[in-house]
């Protein structure tokens, strides 16, 4: 099972036949195992990693640290449930450290992200403070290394 999961995590487009060839199992056995993993929710989604800059789309990613006042009986979950419903929220994690929640937000520009933080996130009951960090460049995402464009060389420094 774990070998199938690793292969699909690396390339979600692999067919049961390709996986069967690599694992020495039958295609039918692999297909049944994948179906079982999907039904159990182990495999949640097949997703492409897209370089939006190369696609010519304007996308801005921001990491937002959120300090939350936990509520009795539910902790951080009540606030997290409200935050995850926003379509702009790409991912949401409970974290250790100085902040409680880590929000990855996708927007079309910095102004849109700022609006989300000021008008949607910060006013939520239980949110005490936020800190926003904009992604300036992506080197690796979901295990995929983004090739870097050749930058013009620096001029030599002479004294």
What are these regions (language model features)?
Residues 1-159:
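A compositional/biophysical signature of low hydrophobicity enriched in polar/charged and small residues
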